[in-house]
Each structure stands twice: as structure tokens, then as C-alpha cells.
């Protein structure tokens, strides 16, 4: 997970130039932690590698093992806070761009896994409602039937996000005055 970050000269979370908050949940304590580049307090982790933070948020319950970091065992932070807008604002961000992935529709050809994943999407969307309302701009990314577990489609997902950002660049520049 560090390979891409290292290509950009970034090794640790604290090396990232713009504010970043990546939520994770310690399965042992049920507490939320944030991998970030802004604070170094007990619930905030800025001394980890970017790869470790990414691995933690990829630890989807029931699918991937928890990510062990120091004395913690992290799962995907979306369990408690899927889009940490309020956390980013606590760190002083004036404006927040939230990224939301559009869930695919269920139809008569949907199987058990499709329905299970859609159920998780519904729960995640409910958890995210307040955060999305508190953000200054929501970039919605359509994933063309790419599911959470379709790890072989990572390049496609990157392209979906890139295309959505380019399509909305005018609005983004206006809101964020870039």
C-alpha cells in the first residue's frame, strides 16, 4: 500500500501536504481513531505509514482480517464514521470536499452477495447523512457496478473518481477558491 505514496515522496501520514483524516475502529475497544497528518494525540495517529492507514480502512469486517498497528486491531472506520467531515473541520479545515460512492441498484438478477452489499450501502449511507450535509461539496462517484470487494477493479475505480473530479472541477475550484 505504500508504493503509490512513496512515488509521490510521501512515507508517513504527517508528510501529506493537505489535511487528511482516515477513520478506523479498534475492534478491541470499539473506539474510533483517525489516521491523519495534523495531530498526534491518543485517538489520532500521524506517525504511521500511509500504507498502514490504507490497510486499516480496507479491513472490512467479515472479509479481511483486522489491521494490527501497535496495540490496536483496526477495522474500516466506516463502521462508525464513513465520511469524517466533522473531524476534518475539528482540525481547522474551512471547507470540506466529501467523496461519496453511488451504490448500484438491485434488480431481479441480484444474488445474495449483491443484496448483502446493498444492505451495507444503506447502513453506510445512513451513517454518512450528517457528514454529507456538513460538507461544502459532495463529489459523487459512480462505480459502474463495481462492488466493495472487486479489488481487481482498483484502476477502474481510480478512473471513476478522476473522471468525476474533472467533470466537477469548475464547481470545486469555485467553492474552494483554487
Across the structure, where does each feature detected by a protein language model lie?
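Patatin-like phospholipase
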Residues: 1-178
Amino acid at each position: 500500500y505504500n508504493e503509490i505514496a512513496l512515488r509521490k515522496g510521501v512515507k508517513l501520514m504527517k508528510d501529506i501536504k493537505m489535511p487528511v483524516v482516515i477513520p478506523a475502529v479498534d475492534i478491541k475497544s470499539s473506539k474510533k481513531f483517525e489516521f491523519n497528518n495534523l495531530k498526534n494525540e491518543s485517538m489520532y495517529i500521524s506517525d504511521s505509514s500511509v500504507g498502514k492507514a490504507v490497510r486499516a480502512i480496507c479491513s472490512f469486517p467479515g472479509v479481511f482480517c483486522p489491521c494490527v498497528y501497535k496495540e490496536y486491531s483496526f477495522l474500516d472506520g466506516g463502521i462508525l464514521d464513513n465520511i469524517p467531515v466533522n473531524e476534518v473541520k475539528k482540525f481547522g479545515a474551512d471547507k470540506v470536499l466529501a467523496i461519496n460512492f453511488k451504490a448500484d441498484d438491485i434488480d431481479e438478477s441480484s444474488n445474495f452477495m449483491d443484496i448483502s452489499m446493498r444492505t451495507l450501502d444503506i447502513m453506510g449511507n445512513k451513517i454518512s447523512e450528517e457528514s454529507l450535509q456538513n460538507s461544502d461539496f459532495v463529489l459523487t462517484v459512480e462505480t459502474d457496478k463495481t462492488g466493495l470487494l472487486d479489488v481487481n477493479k482498483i484502476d477502474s475505480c481510480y478512473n471513476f473518481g478522476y473522471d468525476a473530479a474533472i467533470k466537477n472541477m469548475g464547481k470545486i475550484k469555485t467553492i474552494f477558491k483554487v
